[in-house]
Amino acid sequence: MEIKLFGKWDSETVTVKDPSLKSYISVAPVLVPHTAGRNTKKSFDKAKMNIVERLANKLMANQNNTGKKHETLAIVEEALAIIENRTKENPVQVLVDALENSGPREETTRISYGGIAFLQSVDVSPSRRLDTAFRNIALGASDSAHKNKKTVAQCLADEIIFASKADMQKSFAVRKKEEKERVAQSAR
Protein backbone atom coordinates (compact mmCIF):
# COMPACT_ATOMS: atom_id res chain seq x y z
CA MET A 1 0.00 0.00 0.00
CA GLU A 2 1.29 3.41 -0.96
CA ILE A 3 1.25 6.11 1.71
CA LYS A 4 0.00 9.47 0.47
CA LEU A 5 -0.23 12.80 2.26
CA PHE A 6 -3.78 13.12 3.67
CA GLY A 7 -4.53 10.01 1.57
CA LYS A 8 -4.49 12.15 -1.61
CA TRP A 9 -1.06 13.38 -2.70
CA ASP A 10 2.03 11.37 -3.49
CA SER A 11 5.25 12.88 -2.16
CA GLU A 12 7.58 10.34 -3.77
CA THR A 13 7.77 12.30 -7.04
CA VAL A 14 8.59 15.63 -5.38
CA THR A 15 12.03 16.98 -6.26
CA VAL A 16 14.02 19.73 -4.56
CA LYS A 17 15.97 21.76 -7.12
CA ASP A 18 18.05 23.82 -4.67
CA PRO A 19 21.01 21.66 -3.52
CA SER A 20 21.49 23.60 -0.27
CA LEU A 21 17.89 22.95 0.83
CA LYS A 22 17.81 19.29 -0.22
CA SER A 23 18.73 17.90 3.21
CA TYR A 24 16.44 20.32 5.08
CA ILE A 25 13.20 19.81 3.11
CA SER A 26 11.58 16.57 4.23
CA VAL A 27 8.83 15.19 2.02
CA ALA A 28 8.88 11.68 3.46
CA PRO A 29 5.59 9.86 2.88
CA VAL A 30 3.28 10.31 5.86
CA LEU A 31 -0.49 9.91 6.11
CA VAL A 32 -1.15 12.68 8.65
CA PRO A 33 1.67 15.19 9.25
CA HIS A 34 1.58 15.26 13.05
CA THR A 35 4.70 14.23 14.99
CA ALA A 36 3.51 15.61 18.36
CA GLY A 37 6.84 17.32 18.99
CA ARG A 38 9.05 14.25 18.56
CA ASN A 39 11.48 16.21 16.39
CA THR A 40 12.04 19.10 18.79
CA LYS A 41 14.50 17.47 21.19
CA LYS A 42 17.67 18.28 19.23
CA SER A 43 18.47 21.47 17.37
CA PHE A 44 18.51 20.21 13.77
CA ASP A 45 15.87 17.48 14.11
CA LYS A 46 13.24 19.78 12.66
CA ALA A 47 14.84 19.05 9.27
CA LYS A 48 13.28 15.57 9.59
CA MET A 49 9.78 17.01 10.09
CA ASN A 50 7.48 16.98 7.06
CA ILE A 51 7.22 20.41 5.41
CA VAL A 52 3.42 20.34 5.53
CA GLU A 53 3.53 19.96 9.31
CA ARG A 54 6.07 22.77 9.61
CA LEU A 55 3.75 25.01 7.60
CA ALA A 56 0.83 24.09 9.89
CA ASN A 57 2.98 24.86 12.94
CA LYS A 58 3.81 28.31 11.54
CA LEU A 59 0.10 28.96 10.93
CA MET A 60 -0.52 28.16 14.60
CA ALA A 61 1.77 31.01 15.66
CA ASN A 62 -1.12 33.48 15.38
CA GLN A 63 -2.73 34.18 18.77
CA ASN A 64 -6.15 33.04 17.52
CA ASN A 65 -4.92 29.63 16.33
CA THR A 66 -2.52 28.74 19.14
CA GLY A 67 -2.72 25.02 19.93
CA LYS A 68 -5.35 24.25 17.29
CA LYS A 69 -3.29 21.81 15.26
CA HIS A 70 -6.26 19.86 13.89
CA GLU A 71 -7.81 23.10 12.65
CA THR A 72 -4.61 24.29 10.97
CA LEU A 73 -4.03 20.88 9.36
CA ALA A 74 -7.55 21.12 7.90
CA ILE A 75 -6.70 24.61 6.57
CA VAL A 76 -3.49 23.32 4.98
CA GLU A 77 -5.29 20.31 3.47
CA GLU A 78 -7.95 22.59 1.95
CA ALA A 79 -5.23 24.93 0.63
CA LEU A 80 -3.41 21.99 -1.00
CA ALA A 81 -6.67 20.89 -2.65
CA ILE A 82 -7.19 24.44 -4.00
CA ILE A 83 -3.61 24.47 -5.33
CA GLU A 84 -4.16 21.13 -7.09
CA ASN A 85 -7.39 22.39 -8.70
CA ARG A 86 -5.81 25.62 -9.94
CA THR A 87 -2.39 24.45 -11.10
CA LYS A 88 -3.16 20.81 -12.05
CA GLU A 89 0.17 19.87 -10.42
CA ASN A 90 1.18 18.03 -7.26
CA PRO A 91 0.56 20.62 -4.51
CA VAL A 92 3.50 19.34 -2.44
CA GLN A 93 5.81 20.11 -5.39
CA VAL A 94 4.27 23.60 -5.65
CA LEU A 95 4.92 24.10 -1.91
CA VAL A 96 8.57 23.03 -2.32
CA ASP A 97 9.00 25.48 -5.21
CA ALA A 98 7.42 28.23 -3.10
CA LEU A 99 9.85 27.54 -0.25
CA GLU A 100 12.82 27.65 -2.63
CA ASN A 101 11.68 30.98 -4.08
CA SER A 102 10.80 32.73 -0.82
CA GLY A 103 13.84 31.96 1.34
CA PRO A 104 16.45 34.78 1.35
CA ARG A 105 20.00 33.79 0.39
CA GLU A 106 21.67 36.66 2.23
CA GLU A 107 20.73 39.16 4.89
CA THR A 108 22.42 41.63 7.22
CA THR A 109 23.77 41.46 10.73
CA ARG A 110 24.70 44.34 13.01
CA ILE A 111 28.41 44.64 13.79
CA SER A 112 29.76 47.02 16.40
CA TYR A 113 33.40 48.01 15.95
CA GLY A 114 35.02 50.68 18.09
CA GLY A 115 31.72 52.16 19.21
CA ILE A 116 30.41 52.40 15.65
CA ALA A 117 27.64 50.05 14.59
CA PHE A 118 27.11 49.12 10.96
CA LEU A 119 25.34 46.46 8.93
CA GLN A 120 27.32 43.65 7.32
CA SER A 121 26.02 41.34 4.62
CA VAL A 122 26.09 37.63 5.58
CA ASP A 123 25.02 34.39 3.90
CA VAL A 124 21.97 32.66 5.34
CA SER A 125 22.09 29.04 6.48
CA PRO A 126 19.67 26.67 4.72
CA SER A 127 17.79 26.05 7.97
CA ARG A 128 17.21 29.76 8.55
CA ARG A 129 16.24 30.19 4.89
CA LEU A 130 13.47 27.64 5.32
CA ASP A 131 12.33 29.07 8.66
CA THR A 132 12.09 32.55 7.14
CA ALA A 133 10.23 31.22 4.10
CA PHE A 134 7.68 29.37 6.28
CA ARG A 135 7.21 32.43 8.50
CA ASN A 136 6.67 34.79 5.57
CA ILE A 137 4.26 32.46 3.75
CA ALA A 138 2.17 31.98 6.91
CA LEU A 139 2.27 35.69 7.72
CA GLY A 140 1.29 36.66 4.17
CA ALA A 141 -1.66 34.26 4.22
CA SER A 142 -2.97 35.37 7.62
CA ASP A 143 -2.52 39.07 6.79
CA SER A 144 -4.36 38.78 3.48
CA ALA A 145 -7.20 36.81 5.12
CA HIS A 146 -7.69 39.46 7.83
CA LYS A 147 -10.90 41.46 7.22
CA ASN A 148 -11.41 39.71 3.88
CA LYS A 149 -14.14 37.52 2.42
CA LYS A 150 -11.56 34.90 1.44
CA THR A 151 -10.84 32.11 3.89
CA VAL A 152 -7.36 31.50 5.29
CA ALA A 153 -7.09 28.38 3.12
CA GLN A 154 -7.80 30.37 -0.06
CA CYS A 155 -5.29 33.05 0.94
CA LEU A 156 -2.69 30.40 1.81
CA ALA A 157 -3.22 28.72 -1.57
CA ASP A 158 -2.80 32.09 -3.33
CA GLU A 159 0.38 32.85 -1.38
CA ILE A 160 1.91 29.44 -2.15
CA ILE A 161 1.00 29.59 -5.86
CA PHE A 162 2.39 33.11 -6.30
CA ALA A 163 5.53 32.26 -4.31
CA SER A 164 6.12 29.15 -6.43
CA LYS A 165 6.01 31.36 -9.53
CA ALA A 166 8.31 33.93 -7.79
CA ASP A 167 5.70 36.65 -8.39
CA MET A 168 7.04 39.64 -6.48
CA GLN A 169 3.92 41.76 -7.07
CA LYS A 170 1.44 39.32 -5.52
CA SER A 171 3.46 37.23 -3.06
CA PHE A 172 4.24 38.68 0.38
CA ALA A 173 6.97 36.10 1.03
CA VAL A 174 8.85 36.80 -2.22
CA ARG A 175 8.55 40.55 -1.62
CA LYS A 176 10.09 40.19 1.87
CA LYS A 177 12.88 37.99 0.46
CA GLU A 178 13.73 40.56 -2.21
CA GLU A 179 13.67 43.35 0.38
CA LYS A 180 16.13 41.49 2.67
CA GLU A 181 18.45 40.70 -0.23
CA ARG A 182 18.33 44.31 -1.46
CA VAL A 183 19.31 45.61 2.01
CA ALA A 184 22.09 43.00 2.21
CA GLN A 185 23.41 43.99 -1.21
CA SER A 186 23.60 47.65 -0.18
CA ALA A 187 25.48 46.67 3.00
CA ARG A 188 28.30 44.85 1.18
Swiss-Prot record:
Keywords: Ribonucleoprotein, Ribosomal protein, RNA-binding, rRNA-binding. One of its GO terms (molecular function) is rRNA binding. Transmembrane segments: none annotated. Gene3D superfamilies: Ribosomal protein S7 domain. Disulfide bonds: none annotated. PROSITE patterns: RIBOSOMAL_S7 (PS00052). The keyword Glycoprotein does not apply. It holds the Pfam family Ribosomal_S7. One of its GO terms (cellular component) is small ribosomal subunit. GO terms for biological process: translation. Part of the 30S ribosomal subunit. PANTHER family: RIBOSOMAL PROTEIN S7 (PTHR11205). Belongs to the universal ribosomal protein uS7 family. NCBIfam families: PRK04027.1, uS7_euk_arch. One of the primary rRNA binding proteins, it binds directly to 16S rRNA where it nucleates assembly of the head domain of the 30S subunit. Is located at the subunit interface close to the decoding center. This is Small ribosomal subunit protein uS7. The lineage of its organism: Archaea, Methanobacteriati, Methanobacteriota, Methanomada group, Methanococci. The gene is rps7.
